[in-house]
Amino acid sequence: MRSDTIKKGFDKAPHRSLLRATGLRDEDFDKPFIGIANSYIDIIPGHFFLHEYGEIVKAAIREAGGVPFVFNTIGVDDGIAMGHDGMLYSLPSREIIADSIETVMNAHKLDALICIPNCDKIVPGMIMGALRVNVPTVFVSGGPMAAGHKKDGTPIDLATAFEAVGEHAEGKITDEELYDIECNACPSGGSCSGMFTANSMNTLCEAMGIALPGNGTVLAMTPRRIEMVKAAAKRIVEMAKADDSKYNLKNVLNEKAVHNAFVVDMAMGGSSNTVLHMLAIAREAGVDFPIEKINEIADNVAHIAKISPSLTTVHMDDIDKAGGVNAVMKEISRRGGLLYLENPTVTGETLGERIADAKILNEEIIHRNENAYSQVGGLSILFGNLATEGAVVKTAGIELNMRQFKGTAICFNSQPEAITGIMKHKVKPGNVVVIRYEGPKGGPGMQEMLAPTALIQGMGLGDSVALITDGRFSGATKGASIGHVSPEAAEGGLIAFIEDGDEIELDTDKHLLRLNVSDDVIAARKANYKPYKNEVKSKWLKRYQLLVSNASNGAVLKTEL
């Protein structure tokens, strides 16, 4: 066992002495040492109860014959960090989480790992760190919260609350109606109830085979979720005791698993952030997965499940009751060749064996391929002179009339500037809002743009205004919102040289994003270019700015300058 490095031999007497201080006894030194990476934190609704999960996992590991060691990672709530400079820290937190997993696991030579994430950057951060360690690993997330309901019974969620701010600013709803939404949008603990970033990533854990079935859809703190937590703990001990490299994470999360994740992502219309995170995960897994490959997948996968924010009446609990992610994968597999069904999973089954008996229980929630919302996937990578290295759009959330769009640019050099401009009614129908210098380097930190996109929706401009940015979006964003524009403005990308009134063209079917301005005009602008720079005071963000790559590379940190 890997942990023999710290517990076997006469020369490890000091090490054992320290371990005995934590309560270990003679018999424990022959058992596998299991790391429990918890992400318990009080301020995040999806995490404040995870200390209870940690205790359940500890007890189950001991009962199964392992020795558990809990450690914690940090976490950022993107919703609470939204719309102010706190959002600068969201994406960088992914790197801290990955580094912390690697540090604790390798410093103490633990044999196996069970990760308890739930929200946004915590899931991919834990996956990235676990891949570096490459020991047997199981993920068991906290689970989604239930959808909320207004007093009149209308289902709502966090996206409703953000859009309500724009509606209130326009006088479309009263103070009382806004308060009703505020108090009921997030009714319980768990990751926010739609197919936002957290639930997208928790769902993809199932597709990659690194979590148990139901990980992305079974509600938080329910008896079924608790049983899943116990089962995951039991399984990690079985994997650790086997002491077989076939269970090491990179042998499960391989190139085929990355492909499977993107297939399910397309079928369910996941968050655009999944592109950023899956590209980063692929790099940590040693998988060469060029961004262009995503469109090849999208063009062949039907979009069969539409969930909030794309369809506001459907939430993760509805998907669970309709058969869950297994039912989605089973339906996808009816069109042969889309999923690698022979790929292993942490349960010991192949993916094909896992989904063999899955059934769609409600075809109004999970559609058949032939009755899909679209015969192409819910995400698209756009290319063109504005995005020579790619940009990302969630096609699942775009109205049909906005999938081909030409509009005139109105430019903002930061998210706060854009929010002010939108609130002051500077944005008109037919505009393309450009928010730049918000990329990984420019922000730095690549802020999410939920506040401006929600304002656009709430103010009734969602079917007549597009938005492009080198920043990114919340999974709760909908509309013609194109993010991750690469190269970013801070790298001298063309987005830096757009001026008010320029024509911008997008076509999601053709994967096109183009600035319709002549090369001569662009060359003249470049000759007189004075780059905009955000003032960065934080030492951590300055380090991040120096090391981060662009979005087309997953915004991972470079290991060499």
Swiss-Prot record:
What residues bind [2Fe-2S] cluster, as annotated?
C119, C192
Q: Give the annotated active site.
A: S474
GO cellular component: a single term: cytosol
UniProt entry keywords in alphabetical sequence: 2Fe-2S, Amino-acid biosynthesis, Branched-chain amino acid biosynthesis, Iron, Iron-sulfur, Lyase, Magnesium, Metal-binding
Q: Which GO terms describe its molecular function?
A: 2 iron, 2 sulfur cluster binding; dihydroxy-acid dehydratase activity; magnesium ion binding
Which residues are recorded as modified (N6-carboxylysine)? K121
Q: Which residues bind Mg(2+)?
A: D78, D120, K121, E448
Q: Which GO terms describe its biological process?
A: isoleucine biosynthetic process; L-valine biosynthetic process
Query: Which InterPro entries does the protein's record reference?
Result: Dihydro-acid_dehy_C, DihydroxyA_deHydtase, DiOHA_6PGluconate_deHydtase_CS, ILV_EDD_C, ILV_EDD_N, IlvD/EDD_N
Chemical reaction(s) catalysed: (2R)-2,3-dihydroxy-3-methylbutanoate = 3-methyl-2-oxobutanoate + H2O; (2R,3R)-2,3-dihydroxy-3-methylpentanoate = (S)-3-methyl-2-oxopentanoate + H2O
- SUPFAM superfamilies assigned: IlvD/EDD N-terminal domain-like, LeuD/IlvD-like
Query: What pathway does this protein act in?
Result: Amino-acid biosynthesis; L-isoleucine biosynthesis; L-isoleucine from 2-oxobutanoate: step 3/4; Amino-acid biosynthesis; L-valine biosynthesis; L-valine from pyruvate: step 3/4
Please share the entry's free-text remark on the cofactor. Binds 1 [2Fe-2S] cluster per subunit. This cluster acts as a Lewis acid cofactor.
Q: Which domain of life is it from?
A: Bacteria
Cofactor(s) for this protein?
Answer: [2Fe-2S] cluster; Mg(2+)
What enzyme class is recorded for this protein?
A: lyase
NCBIfam families linked: ilvD (TIGR00110), PRK00911.1 (NF002068)
Quaternary data: Homodimer.
Give the UniProt family note: Belongs to the IlvD/Edd family.
General function of this protein: Functions in the biosynthesis of branched-chain amino acids. Catalyzes the dehydration of (2R,3R)-2,3-dihydroxy-3-methylpentanoate (2,3-dihydroxy-3-methylvalerate) into 2-oxo-3-methylpentanoate (2-oxo-3-methylvalerate) and of (2R)-2,3-dihydroxy-3-methylbutanoate (2,3-dihydroxyisovalerate) into 2-oxo-3-methylbutanoate (2-oxoisovalerate), the penultimate precursor to L-isoleucine and L-valine, respectively.
Task: From the Swiss-Prot or TrEMBL record, give the protein name.
Answer: Dihydroxy-acid dehydratase
Q: Which gene encodes it?
A: ilvD
